[in-house]
Amino acid sequence: MSFSSIVSKFLRYLEIPAKNRTAVNFLRNPDLQPIKSANQTWGFWSNLAYWGAVSFTAGTWMSGSAALSVGLSYPETIVSFLLGNVLTIIFTMANSYPGYDWKIGFTLAQRFVFGIYGSAFGIIIRILMSIVNYGSNAWLGGLSINMILDSWSHHYLHLPNTLSPSVAMTTKQLVGFIIFHVLTALCYFMKPYHMNYLLIWSCVATCFAMLGIVIYLTKNAHGVGELFTSTKSTVTGSKRAWAWVYMISYWFGSISPGSTNQSDYSRFGSSNLAIWTGSVCALLIPATLVPIFGVISASTCDKLYGKQFWMPMDIFDYWLTNNYSAGARAGAFFCGLCFTMSQMSSTISNCGFATGMDMAGLLPKYVDIKRGALFCACISWACLPWNFYNSSSTFLTVMSSFGVVMTPIIAVMICDNFLIRKRQYSITNAFILKGEYYFTKGVNWRAIVAWVCGMAPGLPGIAWEVNNNYFHDSGIVKFFYGDSFFSFLISFFVYWGLCVFFPFKITVRHDDKDYYGAFTDEEARKKGMIPYSEISEEEIRAYTLGECYTTGHEYKPESSDNESPELIKTSSENTNVFEIVHQKDDEKHSFSTTQQVV
């Protein structure tokens, strides 16, 4: 057997089973199609829990430690976080509309903006961010697992470290990390739109756990401690102002990967009102309160124990080490269980499933959401997440770097949706190679240029954040401090300007029929589409299931006044290829385009 035949056989083995995919090509996958209206079940509480799960985590709890690096007082840091939440709401909700309007996820939205081939650019960046975020969340999840195991066994609490001193983790931490990965991997066998119940329960449980910790510490310390109220800002004047800007930018940067792929989950919403109210409440209330809880706990611990414990896991480790009582063990178990649930919910929704959706767009023939999520879990080890939490400055660097890369993508997507396309997209054209979103050789170079222009000025700032001795250019540093503002404006207006001076032709505004069952009959008619219930099963198969590409069936839809797509069969030796020919006439002009369907 030749090497090429071995490779071909291996690739066929890796293909998604035929029952789980609709067509054998690089553009189609069931996970990429719009969500059917029956699965759009996320109401207010589900949307609140989706973003609430991000806040009710150990990472958000300890985020107040960032104030140590920039010199702001803790009250100032909390206010800057509140302003950062407002910025996050603006960017996130503006970037939600592809999911609102057309029930599609981030992957198809990237095809609309960056092109059929160019979409890989934004998708790969989002995958890389998810992998880093996955490792970070999983590490904290492993520490939460250890809270549970510590409460079960005094021996495990004092488990000897058998790893090399040069490794920034212990044997016990490694055990918890592995267990968390295994438990999380089991959740990838459910559909993303079914995990809203896990999100809701984890938010409720962790909220009560956090409240319990803060109330207990505050009661024993007879107040919130002097650290919270008396800590003064160590910077003044313009440095203080830029520190404010930095904390606002950092706060959005830490959440920017989730804001970028917001349409992945906004498409599950039962109504726009539920999406708006749930998301806004979550991004305002828990996202502001949880950092306050973290600061209060560190302040009270400093008064009670002479140490500032920023991680809730460290608090319970201290309690169990000094008093392995039944009460301490019960508290460690239940709080550890709650934090484990919250870390799992955040990791699964914002990292695992997000990567699965993205990879399904890159390699739909070989990867579905489940496989992509498991890949993300495996590769997340490579980013060495145990190094992220060695110091507050390292944590800050990791979190702030997300925004430098992701904010320009958000800016381009928002500009394209509102100013260029006017919130009108053709879903079927996202599965057509040389169709509406082919642009120039499959790439919208305008979007690429706009992203580079917004991203590049922030890269030196990341290097400076890692090592302040690289250079002392205050302009570069200040740009990095306000990157979330500056990069957004640069990319937004560069893309808009390029589209004005180098326009591309928009020939298809939106589909004339709801081929994917994404809307109710009433919603479809409001959008000027023929409802799914009024389309023949034969036509639905032709447009969505790809049946005609394997059976050789030829389908010709009925013509309409405005547009008459005609499915024409052309043959090659081994393959049947179909083309959709669009013909449109009005009083001012007429044109026809031929688009290859794959």
From Swiss-Prot:
User: Transmembrane residues, as ranges?
Assistant: 48-68, 71-91, 112-132, 174-194, 197-217, 241-261, 273-293, 372-392, 395-415, 447-467, 484-504
User: Which of UniProt's keywords are assigned here?
Assistant: Cell membrane, Membrane, Phosphoprotein, Transmembrane, Transmembrane helix, Transport
Q: Which terms does the UniProt entry file under GO BP?
A: 5-amino-1-ribofuranosylimidazole-4-carboxamide transmembrane transport; nicotinamide riboside transport; nucleobase transport; thiamine transport
Q: Name one Pfam family in it.
A: Transp_cyt_pur
Q: Where is it localised?
A: Cell membrane
Q: How does it sit in the membrane?
A: Multi-pass membrane protein
Give the family, as the similarity comment puts it: Belongs to the purine-cytosine permease (2.A.39) family.
What is the name of this protein? Nicotinamide riboside transporter 1
Protein's organism: Saccharomyces cerevisiae (strain ATCC 204508 / S288c) (Baker's yeast)
